[in-house]
Design a protein with these regions (language model features):
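Extracellular secretory-pathway ectodomains and N-terminal mature segments of eukaryotic proteins
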Residues: 1-145
């Protein structure tokens, strides 16, 4: 129990819910991050895996911030996809809160992608969760692209 805290956040794979008494509309939260990762390391070259993971996340970021998307539709500020890594596939997903501008979504996603080495260096899966944006990647499918 947290009697003096009135904010809450719940993260799911396809959405997240953030409730706060602090006015956060159109603002990026740069203070709160939660890092989660798979306990297993990748077999093989970790540097190459990290590079491929960052490339997938960068590609998904560009997809998530497409300006031609209609605001507040199902895929607005959201992207999921996969990348072939030889005989294996890498799956990823990212999203921003829909109150952010496209520019602020991009800034937020850049800030969490930059956390990748700290969070998930060479891990088979990982997440960086933030009240304004989030990403996840795994070596198994966890959302529909």
């Amino acid at each position: 129990r947290c009697p003096n805290n009135r904010g809450r956040i719940i993260w799911y794979d396809n959405c997240f819910l953030y409730i706060s008494e602090i006015y956060t509309y159109e603002k990026i939260d740069f203070k709160h991050y939660l890092y989660l990762h798979n306990a297993k390391d990748v077999s093989g070259n970790k540097k190459l895996f990290n590079k491929n993971t960052k490339a997938l996340l960068d590609k998904l970021k560009e997809k998530a911030i497409r300006k031609e998307q209609e605001p507040y539709t199902r895929d607005y500020m959201y992207a999921a996809g996969e990348e072939s890594l030889g005989t294996t596939k890498l799956y990823g997903m990212m999203q921003c809160t829909q109150d952010l501008s496209v520019k602020n979504c991009s800034v937020c996603l850049d800030s969490i992608i930059a956390k990748l080495p700290r969070c998930c260096n060479g891990k088979q899966g990982g997440r960086v969760l933030n009240p304004s944006c989030t990403f996840r990647y795994e070596l198994y499918p966890f959302v529909k692209p």
